[in-house]
Amino acid sequence: MQTIPLPIRPTAGRWRTADVVALYELPFPELLHRAQSVHREHFDATEIQLSSLLSIKTGGCPEDCGYCSQSARHDSGLAAEKLMPLDEVLAEARAAKNAGAQRFCMGAAWRSPKPHHLEAVAEMVREVKALGLETCVTLGMLQDGQAEQLKEAGLDYYNHNLDTSPEFYGNVVTTRGYQDRLDTLARVRNAGIHVCCGGIIGMGESRRDRASLIAQLANMEPYPESVPINHLVPIPGTPLAEAAPVDVFEFIRTIAVARITMPRAKVRLSAGRQSMSEAEQALCLLAGANSIFYGASLLTTGNPQVQADRALMSKLGMRPETV
């Protein structure tokens, strides 16, 4: 039986984009076998972490991210809202926990949080954490001292995605540079908060761009503990509303490559899952995804219903992760 040699990592311990491309180009069965083997070395392959995501401040963002309906620059029809009151956030968090979620993420459409907003979010973090939920927030760019304030409140994870490769990034966002994102991630890491960082597939990027994104993530020291892989959800009124859909097998390959290059990370099957069949979702889990967003919506896009997710887990013989 012929075996295909795995691309060798450079002795410096860094993934080159060419190495990641070589992983993408493995025959599909071989790639999934390798990804599942790596997955089983570090995780129970029958467990899935269930995360819920709440938009605590929707719309009105000054950034121009081409995929996002929350940008004030796009005519998506989404009305801007103020920051949710604490009691409403806690009601949503309790409902998420009662539905089976172990992790609660809060997202705000800001370029960067103002001091009084950060104080309010810190209080949300404290109260949600007191419910026994793992906490994550995504608030935009952080300035000096802000990550430490969130750490003091007990924040577990901060999400700040790279979105795509450095080479393709300017085609998607112009109001925030790639280095701006890396600077925020450095502040998060230096404050002792776990990093949640991934990207979006299907924005018109090439396979090499996808490989470059994975290399950027895998070469972080250390690589993110949480890696959300999103499938673009085209939203009317945004610049990427007419983006051509990426082949589902290319998306599954991305999950597998993320698992191989970041063995201990939680690889999160994120936006776009609503359009996938049960079989396609099962292949993503086989490829190494071990977390899903659980609930009816993801910020401003749809998500499979809780009952559908429970039914799928039952069919696959999988179960929620034990906290």
Curated annotation (Swiss-Prot):
Residues noted as binding [4Fe-4S] cluster in the record, renumbered to the chain: C61, C65, C68
Transmembrane segments: none
SUPFAM superfamilies linked: Radical SAM enzymes
InterPro entries: Aldolase_TIM, BATS_dom, Biotin_synth/BioAB, Biotin_synthase, Elp3/MiaA/NifB-like_rSAM, rSAM
A GO BP annotation: biotin biosynthetic process
Domain Radical SAM core: 46-264
Record flagged with keyword Repeat: no
GO molecular function: 2 iron, 2 sulfur cluster binding; 4 iron, 4 sulfur cluster binding; biotin synthase activity; iron ion binding
Enzyme class name: transferase
Residues reported in the UniProt entry to bind [2Fe-2S] cluster: C105, C136, C196, R268
Pathway(s) annotated for this protein in UniProt: Cofactor biosynthesis; biotin biosynthesis; biotin from 7,8-diaminononanoate: step 2/2
Sequence similarity: Belongs to the radical SAM superfamily. Biotin synthase family.
Assembly and binders: Homodimer.
HAMAP family per record: BioB
Function: Catalyzes the conversion of dethiobiotin (DTB) to biotin by the insertion of a sulfur atom into dethiobiotin via a radical-based mechanism.
Protein name: Biotin synthase
